[in-house]
Amino acid sequence: DGDMSGEGKGMWFGPRL
C-alpha cells in the first residue's frame, strides 16, 4: 500500500499492477 505501488489507488498504477 503506497503511492508508487498502484494497489488500485487510482492515482498511480506502476509495477504493482
Curated annotation (Swiss-Prot):
Which residues are modified to Leucine amide? 17
Q: Where in the cell is it found?
A: Secreted
MF (Gene Ontology): neuropeptide hormone activity
Q: Name one GO cellular component term.
A: extracellular region
| Keywords in alphabetical order | Amidation, Neuropeptide, Secreted
Q: What GO biological process terms are annotated to this protein in UniProt?
A: neuropeptide signaling pathway
| UniProt key word Secreted | yes
Instruction: Give a brief account of the tissues where this protein occurs.
Output: Expressed in abdominal perisympathetic organs and abdominal ganglia.
At the top level, the lineage of the source is Eukaryota
Q: What's this protein's function?
A: Myoactive.
The UniProt entry's sequence similarity note says: Belongs to the pyrokinin family.
Query: Under which name does UniProt file this protein?
Result: Pyrokinin-5
